[in-house]
């Protein structure tokens, strides 16, 4: 009798159901896709997603030990091609590997956004080159290199930093004074000096500073590799280390840094990769709603 019972339990464990879903089979460069795993039994350990030789841990959805998700960034400079996505998980110490294909396609980003600024903001002096490099290193140390392994959003959907007209989309190729220098790493909102800016979700302020290009900027950690940041601000109403709630006033818009006029530059980094913040918001909120 004991042997029969043991065999029954073993058979149930071996044939447990695991469903894996990808949000996209075709995905634009500069955006984000999601992987969701659902199991009818507790896994031996948290599953992982392997993409382009990088391992991304999957995290529980709302604390459930049977539902996991991961958001994976597609670098803006990714080539148009098929890529492998591997999901690994353990059941009864058996390592299972599942492979999927996604196709990277080029987004319909604007290719000739012309911007005129002072010459010194395009061709930097040695002093400003040193300054810019030092600023980047500070941000990398305090923001880009960090991954908080738990959810700071408290399972809350993202909102927008303000209600205003979008004047420049993520991904646009930017031509400064006649030369293509970069692509737009965020979304610009029309905002006169002094317009209120709100945190797009719960999180922790990890850095506030003045940067050569971005001017006054706030970085907020939302956990699990996601950081939002708000640039060209006039003033800060929060400080480093402070917890903020979604919709909380964090400061006002300004005209600091390399700009042609006052506005808010809103951006998001996921695992140290800039992604379209509005597409990420839409996807994050959709996954949160579908897998409650």
State where each predicted segment sits.
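Surface-exposed, glycine-biased beta-strand/turn segments
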Residues: 99-214
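Sec-dependent N-terminal signal peptides
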Residues: 3-14
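Short, well-structured beta-strand-loop connectors
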Residues: 196-206, 235-253
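Short, surface-exposed secondary-structure boundary micro-motifs
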Residues: 38, 210, 248-249, 255
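Cationic-aromatic interfacial patches
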Residues: 17-110
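Acidic, glycine-rich catalytic/binding loops that coordinate metals and/or anionic ligands
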Residues: 109-141, 145, 239-248, 267-292
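Zn2+-dependent peptidoglycan hydrolase active-site motif and core
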Residues: 185, 200-234, 262, 267
């Amino acid at each position: 009798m004991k042997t029969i019972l043991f065999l029954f339990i073993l058979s149930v464990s071996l044939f447990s159901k695991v469903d894996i879903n990808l949000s996209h089979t075709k995905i634009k460069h500069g955006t984000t896709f999601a992987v969701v795993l659902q199991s009818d039994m507790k896994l031996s350990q948290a599953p992982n997603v392997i993409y382009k030789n990088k391992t991304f841990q999957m995290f529980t959805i709302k604390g459930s030990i049977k539902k996991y998700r991961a958001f994976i960034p597609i670098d803006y400079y990714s080539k148009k091609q098929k890529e492998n996505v591997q999901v690994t998980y353990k059941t009864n110490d058996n390592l299972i590997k599942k492979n999927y294909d996604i196709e990277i396609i080029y987004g319909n980003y604007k290719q000739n956004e012309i911007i005129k600024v002072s010459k010194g903001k395009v061709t930097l002096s040695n002093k400003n080159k040193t300054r810019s490099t030092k600023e980047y290193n500070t941000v990398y140390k305090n923001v880009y290199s960090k991954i908080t392994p738990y959810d700071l959003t408290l399972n809350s959907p993202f909102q927008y930093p303000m209600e205003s007209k979008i004047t420049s989309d993520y991904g646009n190729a930017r031509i400064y004074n006649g030369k293509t220098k970069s692509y737009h790493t965020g979304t610009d909102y029309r905002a006169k000096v002094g317009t209120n800016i709100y945190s797009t979700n719960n999180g922790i302020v990890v850095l506030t500073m003045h940067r050569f290009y971005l001017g006054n900027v706030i970085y907020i950690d939302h956990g699990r590799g996601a950081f939002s940041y708000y640039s060209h601000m006039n003033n800060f109403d929060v400080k480093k280390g402070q917890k903020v709630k979604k919709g909380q006033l964090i400061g006002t818009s300004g005209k600091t840094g390399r700009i042609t006029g006052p506005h808010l530059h809103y951006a998001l980094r996921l695992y140290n990769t800039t992604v379209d913040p509005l597409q990420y918001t839409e996807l994050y909120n959709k996954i949160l709603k579908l897998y409650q």
